[in-house]
Amino acid sequence: MADLKITLIKSAAHRLPKQRAIVKSLGLGRVSSSVVKPNNEATRGAIFHIAHLVSVEEVK
């Protein structure tokens, strides 16, 4: 499986506490920060909850 590059494109400020916690748990801080995470169910579930705040692309 390929990894996922997750980039924060909108701020997590003024969002629900659960959404802010997910952003922090993924290792995202400021807008435009990116992380590479494994493509598994846990990561995809977290992305589902904050899909409106991030962009996701597959990397090999």
UniProtKB/Swiss-Prot annotation:
<protein>
    <recommendedName>
        <fullName>Large ribosomal subunit protein uL30</fullName>
    </recommendedName>
</protein>
<dbReference type="GO" id="GO:0006412">
    <property type="term" value="P:translation"/>
</dbReference>
<dbReference type="InterPro" id="IPR016082">
    <property type="entry name" value="Ribosomal_uL30_ferredoxin-like"/>
</dbReference>
<comment type="similarity">
    <text>Belongs to the universal ribosomal protein uL30 family.</text>
</comment>
<dbReference type="Pfam" id="PF00327">
    <property type="entry name" value="Ribosomal_L30"/>
</dbReference>
<dbReference type="InterPro" id="IPR005996">
    <property type="entry name" value="Ribosomal_uL30_bac-type"/>
</dbReference>
<dbReference type="GO" id="GO:0022625">
    <property type="term" value="C:cytosolic large ribosomal subunit"/>
</dbReference>
<comment type="subunit">
    <text>Part of the 50S ribosomal subunit.</text>
</comment>
<dbReference type="InterPro" id="IPR036919">
    <property type="entry name" value="Ribo_uL30_ferredoxin-like_sf"/>
</dbReference>
<dbReference type="GO" id="GO:0003735">
    <property type="term" value="F:structural constituent of ribosome"/>
</dbReference>
<keyword id="KW-0689">Ribosomal protein</keyword>
<keyword id="KW-0687">Ribonucleoprotein</keyword>
